[in-house]
């Protein structure tokens, strides 16, 4: 719980001006998750928190290590990182996935976001960055050599398989099921969390994908083949035609975020068309398609950041 000063005896919906002290409190809880420090309180108490001084204080606070709270608090809420622990990969299929790896994946995303804030990077680098932050456990999982110890450090990728947020294990695990990837969940997550355009719920009576046959003609079906059977229902096709290509472009990442080329012994077919018609078949192509239309990404991020700062929806 946290307690903040608010003016009393206000009518619902009535606009009012925050005092400098109240503004300082809101700013500090937003950026640091703590009450204001002595410098900010002193300036606020003297009534000197003008627009120019407010900007100076904001920059000072963002440069302070306490602003890492934005990574652990805001990024965690916005990206739903808590879901990383809700549906663990099945140990019968993925015995190397454990609590330490899950924690490292979450920490990677928190540090990645905080680095963009600290270095005042473009928000779009959140998706295009050719680097990330790993410790030895996570580097080994990603196949990145030369990293030892529990300390997280910045590393540069050697190819374009992983780029930015969509190549990070946290997102790939929380959008998977325990025993298989889910292009539907991954596509839905991108639409809902990153683009701010959640698809409608499925119509009643439509069977789950897991109820679709897994074997045909004596061979195991890939997730894509089962999805094609599933969305043959015209009621489902309108939404799935938008979600599925997004998720399929990420299907080279397995349940734990490791890179793969086959599923059930069959080569993966990840080809699809982004909602604007752009062909996408790899994570890099998906990122390029998203960045080709950056306004929805920026608008949705801004709305989520404002909601976090205000403590309410906007």
Each model region followed by its residue ranges:
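Active-site substrate-binding loop specific to GH73 endo-beta-N-acetylglucosaminidase modules
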Residues: 1-309
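Short basic-aromatic helix/loop recognition motifs at nucleic-acid
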Residues: 313
């Amino acid at each position: 719980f946290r307690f903040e000063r608010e003016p009393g005896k206000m009518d619902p919906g009535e606009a009012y001006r925050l005092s400098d002290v109240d503004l300082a409190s809101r700013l500090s809880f937003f950026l640091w998750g703590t009450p204001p420090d002595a410098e900010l309180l002193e300036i606020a108490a003297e009534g000197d928190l003008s627009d120019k001084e407010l900007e100076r204080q904001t920059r000072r606070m963002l440069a302070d290590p306490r602003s890492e709270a934005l990574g652990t608090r805001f990024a965690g809420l916005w990206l739903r990182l808590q879901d990383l622990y809700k549906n663990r990969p099945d140990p019968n299929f993925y015995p190397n996935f454990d609590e330490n790896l899950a924690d490292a994946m979450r920490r990677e995303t928190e540090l990645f976001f905080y680095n963009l804030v600290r270095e005042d990077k473009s928000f779009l680098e959140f998706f295009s960055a050719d680097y990330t932050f790993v410790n030895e456990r996570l580097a080994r999982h990603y196949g990145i050599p030369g990293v030892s110890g529990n300390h997280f450090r910045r590393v540069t990728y050697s190819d374009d398989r992983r780029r930015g947020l969509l190549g990070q294990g946290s997102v790939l695990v929380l959008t998977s099921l325990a025993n298989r990837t889910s292009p539907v969940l991954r596509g839905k997550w991108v639409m809902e969390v990153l683009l701010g355009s959640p698809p409608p719920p499925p119509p009643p009576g439509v069977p789950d994908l897991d109820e679709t046959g897994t074997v045909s003609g004596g061979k195991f079906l890939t997730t894509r083949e089962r999805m094609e059977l599933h969305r043959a229902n015209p009621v489902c096709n309108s939404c799935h035609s938008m979600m599925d290509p997004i998720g399929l472009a990420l299907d080279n990442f397995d349940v734990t975020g490791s890179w793969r080329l086959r599923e059930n012994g069959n080569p993966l077919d990840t080809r699809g068309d982004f909602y604007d018609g752009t062909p996408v078949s790899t994570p890099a192509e998906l990122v390029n398609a998203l960045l080709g239309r950056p306004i929805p990404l920026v608008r949705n991020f801004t709305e989520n950041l404002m909601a976090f700062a205000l403590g309410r929806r906007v």
